[in-house]
């Protein structure tokens, strides 16, 4: 009996201890599983360095893994949470993840994973939260998570997932957050989602979903946020959405939605944000919208909405943004809008609104931005628009406003842009604009303004653009050109008289000066040549007299000079045609005389630009008379002493020789002359005009246009810009379908005309250019501007590119235009990726490698999809050997690598430095040499100094893009760090372009996403006016 009793005693003790032994053994097993999980990861920052076995490990060791970074255990010692966000991890998520049966939370967000998720995730039936957002996971999203009955949060946003949404997620009836924004999902929303009665957040924006917006979403009564924009959803907005009484945020922007806005939305009393912009919505605005009493942001822009703005909009007392631009609205602007106490942005431009602006607009709200341009509005401009002292942009152009400009407008200290052109404004320009510290842009053209331009405008330190053309102004301040930052001054078609002001500061910034069609008299001031940055000077149709100042030939950036329709006398300065930048010269209808200079520009000038000067001759005009030619050479007949007999012999012989030469010369003159004008036919007669232009088109692909088609567009009105090596024209080639190309006419380098060695040097340089153009013509990459071909003759080369409709990156970033392009970080990031990929192609996929040498924002063009294209290879170098040496420093100030200035050695790292500066522009919004920098430093040194002082780098990022969105700030700071690596002082410390690609991929932002919750959204984040106020 004793033996059985002992047996049962030990059996009982063993059975009682089994759970503890099993538990301890399994916990030890979880340590091994974690280590196996870690072995599949790449951890460059060593965040998981404490994940290691204890030194004196025993079978029943302490549960050390519960204290490892990111690991959280439950009360029984099992792994319950794995929180590994923001650790720069990459690699693969191991199948071992399924071996944590108690795992409730898995957070891998904001890392650098570029793999697929294991299907075994479906075995984690205890899972409540899974967050894999902001990575580059690809493939289909794992099926089976719907079996986790307690699942509340699924966030897979900002990845590269594709395929269809898992149908089984509809079984997870406890789900509260479902976020799949910023991926490549397609198909429709699964019908099973109708079961998600506890769902509060539904984010599917930025994918490829199609079909109709499911009506069943309107049955999910717990929903607070719906973000479905940037997809291909069609059809109408479900009326059922009006049942979502808890809804606070509705985003259906940028899709193909049609029909009317449901009136049922007016029942949503908690709704704060409605974004329906860029769809095809029609019909009238429902009056019931006035019932959304909590509404803060309402953006219905870029649709086809008709009818009037309902008066009930004036009941939305919390409204801060009202954007109805680019619709088909009619009627008046309701006066109650002026009573909205929180209104900051009112955008109504490009509609057909009539009547006047509400009299009290601006007096009851902190109005920051008013744009009602391109309507049919009339009446006076309200005087209280800046009553709150917050107004930054006043855009009223292309209407029928009348009366005077209120004096209160020019006492508004926050104003940045004033655009009131194309109205019926009368009276004088009020004084005070020179005292406005932020005013940059002033457009008052095409009105009925009279009187003088206020003297204080010349005192402005911020004004860069002034257009007062097509008015009746009569007095111009003598110091108008002294404004230190003035870049464009257009005052044509006025009644200005007297002499042109000549008070010019030492280093003026003026680039465009247009005083045409006025009554200016006297001579052209010599001091105009002090405008070192002047590109275009237009003085046509005045009453100017005297000679053309010789100093104009020394203006190094002047490209367009129009002096026509004046009373100028004397000769055309001989050096004027030798200017390497001057492309357009018009001196027609003056009183000029003497022979046309024979150098450079004048060899190809259009005779129409010279007509109306009876004394001009030679060149493309009829030849000069003998007496004029002799006098032009300074000969004195009184000093000619020859024997009459000898003289007669010489004359007779000369006549015979001259007759033969005249015939040959006549044909030569006609050939050159007929290239540009039929004017020559009035003087020389031939049987048959030349049928073809002496230009040749060399095509790099099949083209549907000719050299003549290109040449017919080389005129001033088609100029769209200038680069390092030429002037760029837009050419709309007349073929069906219409094709638009960009043509770059290369600058001519000046050289002595009679030097044989220099002539051979010119030929060698031209051969080099053609050789280089041919090489570049073979480049094929989506981020390189495609060269279609080139047109050339014996003297000049014009390169033909595909046309980029969105201009260059520099303008997009730094232009103060209120409708600029890159209004969010995602767009800027994509530009950066495009530039890096284009450079990678040049450096690694071309043989020999191509070093661009002039990477800068102005040489990065944007196509119709805002994708970056590298352009302007005028300084490009084919690098056959490492560290090749060039003969001189080339590039653009602010972008040039420091070693380039003293070694003249180039390699890929020179381009990397310039790329880093472009990245800094994208992140900070600053120019390489920005007026806000002290001590004349550049953007690189500006940031380095902040780093040395341990100042927060969050202060340098572009606040208009980042807003208050924390994850956007983090993403921009990542890009900033990459830029700092690229701009390291020593070339060896800079990454290769392939390394930049890797790092930039790790900094990938959330695709078309917003902040996690509506409360974390920066103001106007998803609206077309984001970042513009």
From Swiss-Prot:
Location within or outside the cell:
Cell membrane
Outcome of gene disruption? Reduced procambial cells number, and adjacent or interspersed xylem and phloem formation.
Q: What is its EC number?
A: 2.7.11.1
In terms of superkingdom, the source organism counts as Eukaryota
Q: Which Pfam families match?
A: LRR_1 (PF00560), LRR_8 (PF13855), LRRNT_2 (PF08263), Pkinase (PF00069)
**Residue intervals annotated with topology Cytoplasmic:** 666-1029
From the record, give the transmembrane residue ranges: 645-665
**Which SUPFAM superfamilies does the annotation name?**
L domain-like, Protein kinase-like (PK-like), RNI-like
Coiled-coil spans are none
According to the entry, every stretch annotated as the Protein kinase domain falls at 714-1007
GO biological-process terms attached to the record: cell differentiation; phloem or xylem histogenesis; procambium histogenesis
Identify the InterPro entries for this entry.
Answer: Kinase-like_dom_sf (IPR011009), Leu-rich_rpt (IPR001611), Leu-rich_rpt_typical-subtyp (IPR003591), LRR_dom_sf (IPR032675), LRR_N_plant-typ (IPR013210), Plant_LRR-RLKs (IPR050647), Prot_kinase_dom (IPR000719), Ser/Thr_kinase_AS (IPR008271)
Q: What is its main location?
A: membrane
Phosphotyrosine: residues bearing it: 801, 841, 895, 902
State what this protein does: Involved in the regulation of procambium maintenance and polarity during vascular-tissue development. Phosphorylates HIRD11 and LHCA1 in vitro.
The identity of this protein, by name, is Leucine-rich repeat receptor-like protein kinase PXL1
């Amino acid at each position: 009996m004793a033996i059985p009793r002992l047996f049962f005693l030990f059996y009982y003790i063993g059975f009682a201890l089994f759970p503890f032994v099993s538990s301890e053994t399994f916990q030890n097993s979880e340590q091994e599983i974690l280590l196996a999980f870690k072995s599949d990861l790449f951890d460059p920052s060593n965040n998981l360095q404490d994940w290691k076995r204890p030194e004196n490990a025993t079978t029943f060791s302490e549960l050390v893994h519960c204290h490892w970074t990111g690991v959280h255990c439950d009360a029984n010692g099992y792994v319950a949470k794995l929180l590994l966000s923001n650790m720069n991890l990459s690699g693969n998520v191991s199948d071992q993840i399924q071996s944590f049966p108690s795992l409730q939370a898995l957070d891998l967000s904001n890392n650098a994973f570029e793999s697929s998720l294991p299907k075994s995730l479906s075995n984690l039936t205890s899972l409540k939260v899974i967050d894999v957002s902001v990575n580059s996971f690809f493939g289909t999203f794992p099926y089976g998570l719907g079996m986790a009955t307690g699942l509340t949060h699924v966030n897979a946003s900002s990845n590269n997932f594709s395929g269809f949404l898992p149908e089984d997620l509809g079984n997870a009836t406890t789900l509260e957050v479902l976020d799949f924004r910023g991926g490549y999902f397609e198909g429709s929303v699964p019908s099973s989602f109708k079961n998600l009665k506890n769902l509060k957040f539904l984010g599917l924006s930025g994918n490829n979903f199609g079909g109709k917006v499911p009506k069943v979403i309107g049955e999910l009564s717990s929903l607070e946020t719906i973000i479905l924009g940037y997809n291909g959803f069609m059809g109408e907005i479900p009326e059922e959405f009006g049942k979502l009484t808890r809804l606070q945020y509705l985003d259906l922007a940028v899709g193909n939605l049609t029909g009317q806005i449901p009136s049922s939305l007016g029942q949503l009393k908690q709704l704060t944000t409605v974004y329906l912009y860029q769809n095809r919505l029609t019909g009238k605005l429902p009056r019931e919208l006035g019932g959304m009493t909590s509404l803060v942001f309402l953006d219905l822009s870029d649709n086809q909405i008709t009818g009037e703005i309902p008066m009930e909009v004036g009941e939305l007392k919390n409204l801060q943004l009202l954007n109805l631009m680019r619709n088909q609205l009619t009627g008046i602007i309701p006066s109650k809008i002026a009573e909205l106490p929180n209104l900051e942005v009112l955008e109504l431009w490009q509609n057909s609104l009539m009547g006047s602006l509400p009299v009290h607009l601006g007096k009851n709200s902190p109005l920051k931005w008013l744009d009602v341009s391109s309507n049919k509005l009339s009446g006076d401009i309200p005087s209280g628009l800046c009553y709150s002292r917050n107004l930054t942009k006043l855009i009223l152009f292309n209407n029928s406003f009348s009366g005077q400009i209120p004096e209160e407008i020019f006492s508004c200290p926050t104003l940045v842009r004033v655009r009131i052109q194309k109205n019926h404004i009368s009276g004088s320009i009020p004084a005070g604009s020179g005292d406005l510290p932020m005013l940059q842009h002033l457009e008052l053209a095409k009105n009925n303004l009279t009187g003088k331009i206020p003297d204080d405008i010349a005192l402005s330190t911020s004004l860069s653009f002034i257009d007062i053309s097509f008015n009746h102004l009569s007095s111009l301040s003598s110091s108008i050109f002294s404004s230190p930052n003035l870049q464009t001054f257009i005052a044509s078609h006025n009644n200005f008289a007297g002499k042109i002001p000549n008070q010019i500061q030492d280093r003026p910034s003026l680039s465009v000066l247009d005083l045409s069609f006025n009554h200016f008299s006297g001579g052209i001031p010599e001091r105009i040549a002090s405008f070192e940055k002047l590109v275009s000077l237009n003085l046509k149709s005045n009453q100017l007299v005297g000679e053309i100042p010789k100093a104009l030939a020394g203006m190094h950036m002047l490209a367009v000079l129009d002096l026509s329709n004046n009373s100028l006398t004397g000769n055309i300065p001989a050096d004027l045609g030798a200017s390497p930048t001057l492309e357009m010269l018009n001196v027609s209808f003056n009183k000029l005389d003497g022979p046309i200079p024979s150098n450079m520009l004048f060899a190809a000038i259009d005779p129409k630009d010279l007509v109306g000067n009876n004394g001009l001759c030679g060149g493309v005009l009829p030849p000069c008379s003998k007496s004029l030619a002799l006098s032009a050479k300074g000969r004195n007949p009184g000093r000619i002493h020859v024997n009459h007999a000898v003289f007669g012999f010489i004359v007779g012989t000369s006549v015979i020789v001259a007759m033969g030469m005249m015939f040959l010369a006549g044909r030569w003159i006609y050939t050159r002359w007929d290239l540009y004008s039929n004017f020559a036919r009035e003087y020389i007669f031939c049987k048959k005009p030349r049928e073809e232009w002496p230009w040749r088109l060399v095509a790099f692909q099949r083209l549907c246009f000719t050299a003549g088609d290109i040449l017919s567009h080389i005129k001033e009105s088609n100029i769209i810009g200038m680069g390092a090596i030429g002037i760029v024209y837009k050419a709309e080639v007349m073929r069906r379908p219409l094709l638009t190309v960009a043509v770059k006419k290369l600058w001519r380098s000046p050289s002595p005309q009679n030097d044989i060695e220099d002539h051979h040097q010119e030929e060698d340089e031209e051969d080099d250019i053609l050789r280089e153009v041919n090489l570049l013509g073979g480049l094929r990459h989506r981020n390189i501007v495609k060269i279609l071909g080139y047109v050339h003759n014996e003297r000049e080369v014009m390169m033909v590119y595909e046309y980029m409709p969105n201009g260059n990156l520099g303008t997009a970033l730094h232009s103060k235009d209120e409708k600029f392009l890159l209004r969010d970080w995602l767009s800027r990031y994509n530009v950066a990726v495009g530039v890096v990929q284009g450079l990678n192609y040049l450096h690694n996929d071309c043989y020999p490698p191509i070093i661009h040498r002039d990477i800068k924002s102005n040489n990065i063009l944007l196509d119709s999809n805002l994708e970056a294209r590298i352009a302007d290879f005028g300084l490009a170098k084919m690098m056959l050997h490492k560290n090749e040496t060039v003969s001189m420093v080339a590039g653009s100030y602010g972008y040039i690598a420091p070693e380039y200035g003293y070694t003249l050695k180039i390699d890929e790292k020179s381009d990397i430095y310039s790329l880093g500066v472009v990245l800094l522009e994208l992140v900070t919004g600053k120019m390489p040499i920005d007026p806000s920098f002290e001590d004349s430093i550049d953007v690189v040194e500006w940031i380095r100094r902040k780093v040395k002082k341990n100042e927060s780098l969050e202060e340098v990022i572009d606040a208009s893009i980042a807003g208050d969105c924390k994850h956007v700030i983090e993403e921009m700071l990542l890009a900033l760090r990459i830029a700092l690596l690229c701009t390291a002082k020593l070339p060896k410390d800079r990454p290769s372009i392939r390394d930049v690609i890797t790092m930039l991929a790790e900094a990938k932002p959330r695709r078309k996403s917003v902040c996690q919750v509506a409360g974390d959204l920066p103001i106007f984040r998803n609206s077309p006016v984001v970042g513009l106020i």
